[in-house]
């Protein structure tokens, strides 16, 4: 049954940090299928950005993918788990569970329960160990520890620690890179992931926009992009320990500069950036065979996304290199570039921890600026593309406790640690932490359909801050860099007046519910029609930015476009539409023909956003209030 399968999958991820015994990995005893894995030592920090780690992970998930049936997959995975690096094993096993047909409907347990040490600072984990060791042997009562602050106000960036260190955001980033591994080889799997390069651009662009909104909410200036490969970088201390080895994710002192590694020189990265920018301005990229591939409006962003990341779909890996991934690796090794001190890398090396570091956002704004440079070569959308004839949006209301105001507060949350680390025999070991949460709300959009027939519309909802850090109104073309997508959905409009109502919990960017390890072991919420994309998505408690105490003003932007022109064949039957805007849809095309981020993905030549509007758009000013 599905439940039995789910239990077997859960057991693969239980107590992973102590699954391998260092020095016990005599590979000769293992199945011949596993001969290409076991290079990365158990206890080392696995990096989803380092080419060597990624290649070994690819070998392993291809072995899992090739397993004859579900039973064979579980058995070979159980064997690999005994000697393969635990982070690499989790990555490969998750990719396999997410993509094997006989695993449809199964969930991977939440990464924050598999590796709580990547999410919960070491002081709290240490406290849990201590509490477990000083109690009588027969005592099984639950243990609760509190997560302590990891910094203080001497560091201006500390004001955003609540956001960067949010468990849900970091788990989303880990999961997104499993659904879209950079080593995914469409020729080998016989499945192309639709618009994967463009999704890489869009998902990270939205992360940057959301981070800037959060900075403005805290009275800080929007971030400055990383810009110059020779500049000293700001420091960061993660306070995380890697339980599998007992070593910590290295902090980065203030003022270090990027330095050459054995694998890559900084001058090579400068050259990669130059070559990509040259190609953008020439309007084409050079393929491996020397032919030119035009960066047209339809595929340009997708081609660039594969180049910049870079993934297996890069048109010319030798020439354009691997800019984004090497940036993560060099920043993570900045404190010990040649390995002379045997230091562990910093958090930038790992997708489940890199969002904690402020430098992540500076780096990604730098990457986003490359795409921005390309988007600026495209013509602004003209009236005919933006307009939806006969459709007029007359008003928009955001319904909450107070109309057009969203209230935020801090909420207490507990994370179960016992499946990842369990010293002793406690029934449960939980870490208590606080995260932001906003009240649920809904949108009511009043639309007039002036035609005589029913129309199908795509409703696109965005939010953007009204004022910049100095209190000036943000101009339209600048605004599009901080516009965040809140929702996108299909609706039917009858002739005459229509009111379209949509709840915030149904958003196309957020994850509505993630079952815990315990839920999965007990078979809660299992359904054969669910797909892997159901566990990818932005955390719903951070759908909107936090605002401030007096109520920060935002533009709520609503646009209706013609669904008959937007629809993609076959996208009606997508089993999981949870976070389709950021995560796409399994084995289907991305269910929207328009470019991701439309209409804010191209230059806007009007000064005020109000001059940009056509009849099918509407802007309502709303407030977001934060209560201590």
UniProtKB/Swiss-Prot annotation:
One of its GO terms (molecular function) is oxidoreductase activity. GO terms for biological process: oxygen transport. Pfam families: Hemocyanin_C, Hemocyanin_M, Hemocyanin_N. It comes from the Eukaryota. The modification Blocked amino end (Thr) is found at residue 1. PANTHER family: FAT-BODY PROTEIN 1-RELATED, LARVAL STORAGE PROTEIN/PHENOLOXIDASE. This is Hemocyanin II. It comes from Limulus polyphemus (Atlantic horseshoe crab).
